[in-house]
């Protein structure tokens, strides 16, 4: 069994076992969960209910040696929220009660994998927009 499949029941149990009253977009919903993608440092699952589509990210490592890696990602996404160039973060849990590392729930942005030859100009424009975002 691969890591994505191994964590899938835990993701489902987490979604069912938590009271989501503090996260308005998730309140009172029953979610479908499907593996989305695995990176070097995160496992990503698409969660959906009706027209709502989100990403449930399980942190599994860090390249910058941070114990609070998922909180760091959440805060970075919060800072970029106004840019419109990054997914909106909705929830972070770094308590480590259900997962050895933290989890993050964020907006799902549809698209295709980056093709450097085809997408370099668009990627450069996106990075320029991100770098122009004012932060407090």
Language model features with spans:
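Juxta-kinase regulatory segment immediately upstream of eukaryotic protein kinase catalytic domains
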Residues: 1-32
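ATP-binding pocket architecture of kinase catalytic cores
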Residues: 34-136
């Amino acid at each position: 069994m691969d890591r994505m499949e191994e964590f899938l029941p835990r993701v489902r149990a987490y979604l069912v076992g938590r009271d989501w009253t503090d996260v308005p977009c998730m309140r009172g919903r029953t979610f479908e969960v499907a593996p989305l993608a695995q990176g070097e440092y995160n496992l990503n699952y698409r969660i959906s209910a009706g027209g709502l589509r989100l990403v449930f990210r399980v942190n599994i490592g860090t390249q910058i040696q941070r114990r609070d890696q998922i909180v760091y990602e959440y805060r970075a996404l919060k800072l970029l929220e106004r840019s419109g160039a990054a997914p909106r973060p909705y929830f972070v849990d770094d308590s480590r009660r259900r997962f050895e590392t933290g989890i993050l729930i964020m907006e799902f942005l549809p698209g295709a994998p980056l093709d450097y030859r085809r997408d370099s100009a668009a990627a450069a424009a996106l990075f320029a927009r991100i770098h122009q975002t004012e932060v407090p």
